[in-house]
């Protein structure tokens, strides 16, 4: 995919969705033509992870039942299904996992999802499976060694074998915690994720990252443990507060910038429609975002290289979260983090002013913040937080930046002056170049 225009990238993803529009055909017919380098400088291959961006042809499959399906490739391929009222797909995920759930099914959920978990339990029992319901606290505080130990004890009491299966029903914290419990029980049993927030659907539940927090920081203890299946049941979003839904769009828009320009078009064209849980537009955005992530993690599960591009915007976002004591939602911080990264890239001569402005326009259309006034005068504090970022090497802040939409570059080390100018632009303490 390196060297493709954004239109060609979008066309390939449209083919994955089964589209056959004339514009799609024209873009695909031009694949042999090199991308225009106007406004950008040539990049060395080592700088970019763009070579894994495009999902395999037909990777996104639209069924007659209205569901969108996608296979995440890798050593242990698994299916992601997106749609509404997917209780039957939860059962299919379990019975299709190694062992088929014969060794028992641990259905782990947060208290607020008692009723929905009950529906999944009914379906699993109807399939002849032995089911144990386990409740865990919601939110980041659940990702602790104490809660994890409780899960181990309960898995032991139910005598779960290697032919058993764990089902996680909840947000990103729940899928992180339960995924790690599954990764460590008997050195690994299958897990099926049923994410119940938009953020979890497009981010935490797909990719195989699991873990808990410690006193030293977030997600410092964990494992890569790909799920046996991911079921994105959009019906659960009906009860999600609008602000939480919008926060999930932060990762969606990020995916648009790093790989799929069609996402940006949908967000800016239908800003009201994309926050309706039952809208086809939202279903498409979830599927497209998952396709972007799947294309990357299928080639780089353990974040050895190209997977870093999924961290676009996260260097500054994590600093924003820390500076606000995590009062900012992750997707909100990612939105500002992407604007910061665009400011950095523009000041380094990599990114046009138009694409910088597009960052503010797209995230604003999604109802997300594009500035961080609380950070004014706190540059040194945020830089210190950025030095704790996992991409740091030998003390140097390394970032994922864009040369254009769908043209990410990784492993870049901006100097302190550029970082300060970008920080001042997003905090309002200095001139912004994309207003």
Predicted stretch roles:
Residues 173-180, 201-202, 318-319:
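Short glycine/serine/threonine-rich phosphate/pyrophosphate-binding segments
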Residues 100, 159-161, 184-186, 212-214, ...:
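Solvent-exposed alpha-helices and their adjacent loops that cap or buttress functional pockets
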Residues 180-273:
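A glycine/threonine-rich phosphate-anchoring loop and its flanking beta-alpha core
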Residues 2-43:
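C-terminal peripheral helix-coil segments that are non-catalytic and often amphipathic
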Residues 265-380:
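Active-site segments that bind and position negatively charged phosphate/pyrophosphate groups
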Residues 41, 65, 250-253, 350-435:
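C-terminal charged capping/lid subdomain of soluble metabolic enzymes
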Residues 49-165:
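ATP/NTP phosphate-donor binding region
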């Amino acid at each position: 995919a390196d060297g493709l225009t954004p239109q060609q990238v979008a066309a390939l993803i449209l083919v994955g969705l089964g589209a056959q529009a004339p514009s799609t055909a024209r873009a695909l017919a031009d694949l042999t033509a090199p991308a225009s380098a106007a406004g950008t400088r040539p990049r060395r291959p080592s700088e970019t992870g763009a070579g894994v961006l495009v999902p395999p042809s037909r990777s996104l499959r639209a069924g007659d039942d209205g569901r969108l399906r996608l296979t995440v490739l890798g050593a242990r391929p698994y299916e992601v299904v997106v749609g509404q009222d997917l209780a039957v797909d939860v059962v299919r995920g379990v019975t299709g996992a190694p062992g088929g759930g014969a060794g028992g099914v641990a259905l782990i959920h947060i208290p607020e999802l008692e009723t929905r978990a009950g529906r999944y339990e009914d379906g699993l029992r109807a399939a002849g499976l032995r089911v144990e319901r386990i409740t865990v606290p919601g939110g980041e505080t659940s990702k602790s060694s104490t809660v994890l130990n409780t899960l181990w004890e309960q898995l032991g009491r139910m005598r779960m074998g290697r032919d058993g299966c764990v089902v996680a029903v909840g947000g990103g914290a729940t899928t992180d915690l339960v995924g790690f419990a599954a990764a460590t029980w008997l050195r690994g049993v299958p897990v099926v994720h049923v994410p119940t927030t938009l953020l979890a659907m497009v981010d935490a539940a797909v990719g195989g990252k699991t873990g808990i927090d410690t006193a030293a920081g977030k997600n410092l203890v964990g494992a890569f443990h790909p799920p046996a299946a991911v079921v994105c049941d959009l019906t659960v979003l009906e009860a999600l507060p609008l602000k939480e839904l919008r926060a999930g769009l932060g990762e969606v828009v990020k995916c648009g910038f790093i790989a799929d320009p069609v996402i940006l078009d949908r967000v800016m064209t239908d800003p009201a429609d994309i926050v309706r849980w039952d809208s086809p537009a939202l279903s498409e955005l979830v599927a497209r975002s998952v396709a972007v992530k799947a294309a990357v993690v299928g080639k780089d599960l353990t974040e050895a290289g190209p997977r870093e591009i999924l961290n676009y915007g996260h260097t500054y976002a994590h600093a924003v979260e820390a500076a606000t004591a995590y009062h900012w939602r992750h997707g909100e911080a990612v939105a500002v983090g992407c604007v910061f990264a665009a400011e950095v890239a523009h000041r380094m001569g990599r990114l046009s002013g138009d694409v910088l402005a597009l960052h503010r326009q797209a995230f604003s259309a999604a109802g997300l913040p594009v500035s961080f006034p609380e950070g004014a005068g706190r540059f040194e504090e945020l830089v210190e937080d950025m030095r704790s970022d996992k991409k740091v090497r030998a003390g140097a802040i390394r970032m994922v930046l864009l040369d254009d939409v769908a043209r990410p570059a990784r492993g870049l080390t901006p100097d302190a002056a550029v970082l300060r100018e970008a920080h001042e632009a997003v905090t309002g303490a200095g001139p912004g170049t994309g207003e």
